[in-house]
């Protein structure tokens, strides 16, 4: 049995001269055949992969800093790492700070909803992400759209294996995943299975109770 550790840094955080707790944790961990460790810098540290120009990369970088743009890419990257490395009986640990904490939560939610795709199904990751992020409201009931949870159940049994995270260590979760229009008006988007994390064996969340933010 191995440990697979996922470390997701916060908004604007990457390796520097004043590193976050996520980088320090990554640095402190042993990396061996029995423990595989992954680190991803936070949103807003680089432009979108699909941005073709320097201006586009700069613009998407600022969107990441302000509004969390790039969060989905970070979730998909961590998920892809798990696909390549996970073996039955491995224990999965996820850590994250700020929007990286929400990335960690969302990864746990994606695993609960869609399972972990078997190797060779990398092309299905965008579909799984799209299904996971799809916002359901009363519009769907009116149009007779099948529930994404109904679709996900069949998708999971067809393409995936179960992968239940053992531990989630979080600092100051910040969620910012946008808005969508429903019959009742504009509603804040959310991703399923990210609130209570009942699918994770152990959850620890450290919160700065006295922190002051401008928004």
Per-range role (PLM):
Residues 1-215:
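Alpha-helical segment proximal to the catalytic Tyr-Lys
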């Amino acid at each position: 049995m191995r440990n697979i550790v996922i470390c997701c840094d916060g908004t604007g955080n990457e390796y520097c001269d004043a590193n976050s707790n996520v980088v320090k944790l990554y640095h402190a961990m042993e990396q061996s055949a029995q423990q595989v460790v992954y680190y991803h810098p936070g949103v807003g540290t680089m432009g979108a992969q699909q941005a073709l120009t320097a201006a586009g990369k700069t613009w998407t970088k600022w969107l990441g800093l302000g509004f969390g743009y790039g969060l989905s890419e970070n979730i998909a990257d961590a998920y892809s790492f798990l696909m390549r490395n996970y073996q039955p009986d491995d224990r999965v640990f996820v850590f994250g700070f700020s929007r990286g904490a929400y990335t960690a939560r969302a990864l746990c939610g994606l695993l609960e909803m869609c399972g972990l795709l078997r190797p060779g199904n990398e092309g299905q990751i965008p579909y799984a992400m799209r299904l996971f992020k799809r916002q359901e409201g009363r519009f769907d009931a009116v149009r007779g759209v099948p529930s994404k949870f109904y679709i996900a159940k069949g998708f999971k049994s067809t393409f995936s294996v179960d992968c239940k995270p053992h531990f989630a260590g979080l600092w100051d979760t910040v969620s910012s995943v946008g808005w969508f229009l429903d019959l009742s008006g504009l509603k804040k988007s959310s991703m399923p299975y990210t609130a209570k994390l009942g699918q994770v064996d152990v959850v620890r969340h450290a919160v700065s109770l006295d922190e002051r933010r401008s928004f």
